[in-house]
């Protein structure tokens, strides 16, 4: 794996661990567990930690968006149900008035 000279030793370790994880994941039906050395390297790298935090934040925002959409759908259904009940009450009142007028 060629590495440029302007990368420090820590960057090189992180890159090698990322390559190890990706290649194990993509090349085997049952991926091998990540080596302890790579696990520690990746856990200690602030860039990886930042990416994971960002990923968790995006997941949380997506969950909030889905929850909001579900709440709006439920509110819309409640509003539609209330409108249908109001229309049914008006219709019943109109029928009552029509019967009263027919009796005259």
Swiss-Prot record:
* Ranges that cross the membrane: none
Please give the positions of the paired cysteines in each disulfide bond.
Answer: 17-38
Keyword flag Glycoprotein:
no
Q: List the record's Gene Ontology CC terms alphabetically.
A: chromaffin granule; extracellular space; secretory granule; transport vesicle
Keyword field: Cytoplasmic vesicle, Disulfide bond, Secreted
What's a single GO BP term from this record? negative regulation of insulin secretion
Please describe what this protein does.
Answer: Chromogranin A probably has a paracrine role in the regulation of secretion or maturation.
Matching entries from Pfam families are given as: Granin
- The encoding gene: CHGA
Its assembly, as annotated, is: Dimer.
Q: Where is this protein localized, as stated in its record?
A: Cytoplasmic vesicle, Secretory vesicle; Secreted
State the similarity comment: Belongs to the chromogranin/secretogranin protein family.
- Name the UniProt record assigns to this protein: Chromogranin-A
Which PANTHER family is this protein grouped with? CHROMOGRANIN, CHROMOGRANIN-A
Question: In its keyword annotation, does this UniProt entry include Cell division?
Answer: no
């Amino acid at each position: 794996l060629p590495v440029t000279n302007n990368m420090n030793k820590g960057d090189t370790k992180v890159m090698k661990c990322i390559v190890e994880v990706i290649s194990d994941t993509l090349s085997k039906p049952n991926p091998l567990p990540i080596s302890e050395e790579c696990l520690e390297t990746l856990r200690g790298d602030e860039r990886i930690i930042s990416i994971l935090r960002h990923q968790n934040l995006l997941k949380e925002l997506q969950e909030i968006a889905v929850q909001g959409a579900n709440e709006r759908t439920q509110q819309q259904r409640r509003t539609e149900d209330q409108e249908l009940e109001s229309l049914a009450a008006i219709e019943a009142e109109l029928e009552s008035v029509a019967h009263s007028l027919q009796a005259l």
